């Protein structure tokens, strides 16, 4: 435990000088005397000076202030005491409900499980959302990315997934809010409370208004809590909203740390930072972590370095499309762009596989015919193509679904559709069993029986 003093402050990056024989190690936590600010060592510059990132506001700090080393990395509460609580990046409670009362604290920087400890598995995780269960099914213990630009429904989709899985799957969840809107964090807390699943969720927030240090580390705080549950032999869900802001926080401090920016101004360590986080999100022989991550896509460009780096780590990608949202079809998942490693007849069965590929074929063909329809009109199509277009439009509408978490906005009650019903419904449309029904009947319904009932009222 040594003591040093601040010699330079540039934004969130602070240089501290220590005696040369007592320089703190990389990732060690430092405490500024007389101020509630924690720093994390990032670099050793030589001559006893270390460069650190502030985990909190740097207001009120000045050169010459004394800083104590703690001899350890930032540690956060883990275990059941964290459930139903909202914490910040350092594990301090921010929900005004008293101390956490944890029995154990873990450091946020941990080794990823070794190859020998990791476990593979092909068990499906049913979400109750038709389009996801059909074309990009999730694996238990897998990683899923929700990709989308601004305002196409990433957070709403994520809230629906948490609600469905918490109620139907009754496991523990950890939610890390990384650089998102504080309002959404608040809505999210109340949504969980109203659904009576709050006692199964630990919430960690480092929102948009927080300094970059908080946003850079809050995902690791949430992940550490999830790892504890996993190591106790549980199946945990880890939700990260939004992984792009984790990258962005790294970009903000990267230049201040003296690194040259790389492509599009991102930090040169982008792939490594992403890998450090993603490699820890994995299932071991003790338990599993299934992670669902929202990924903001800047300017709807999927080739941007940040989303492109994330793609490599995922088992399933759910792509939300502005074109589909503009048709009023929610969830606005693009069934042609979304993929899953599980979409394999050996994993999901031949019936499910054939139905999913059939749906994608019909929608792809409809996409190709749209140009002809726009120029020449429907009458110029062959009878077979006319039938295909009619079915495609029904499928497109049947891929929509009312959400439980959106009841307040839509006024229609949410629907949970089992995988069996989902496959049966789409199979029926592909086989022409519902050719006689109008396409409006398929819009915003749950199962296919509901569409048949709706058609009678039209």
Swiss-Prot record:
It is a peripheral membrane protein. Transmembrane segments: none annotated. The keyword Cell membrane applies. ATP binds at residues 148-155. GO terms for molecular function: ATP binding; ATP hydrolysis activity; proton-transporting ATP synthase activity, rotational mechanism. GO terms for cellular component: plasma membrane; proton-transporting ATP synthase complex. It catalyses: ATP + H2O + 4 H(+)(in) = ADP + phosphate + 5 H(+)(out). The keyword Membrane applies. Keywords: ATP synthesis, ATP-binding, Cell inner membrane, Cell membrane, CF(1), Hydrogen ion transport, Ion transport, Membrane, Nucleotide-binding, Translocase, Transport. Its EC number is 7.1.2.2. It is found in: Cell inner membrane. Produces ATP from ADP in the presence of a proton gradient across the membrane. The catalytic sites are hosted primarily by the beta subunits. F-type ATPases have 2 components, CF(1) - the catalytic core - and CF(0) - the membrane proton channel. CF(1) has five subunits: alpha(3), beta(3), gamma(1), delta(1), epsilon(1). CF(0) has three main subunits: a(1), b(2) and c(9-12). The alpha and beta chains form an alternating ring which encloses part of the gamma chain. CF(1) is attached to CF(0) by a central stalk formed by the gamma and epsilon chains, while a peripheral stalk is formed by the delta and b chains. Belongs to the ATPase alpha/beta chains family. This is ATP synthase subunit beta. It comes from Pseudomonas aeruginosa (strain ATCC 15692 / DSM 22644 / CIP 104116 / JCM 14847 / LMG 12228 / 1C / PRS 101 / PAO1). The gene is atpD.
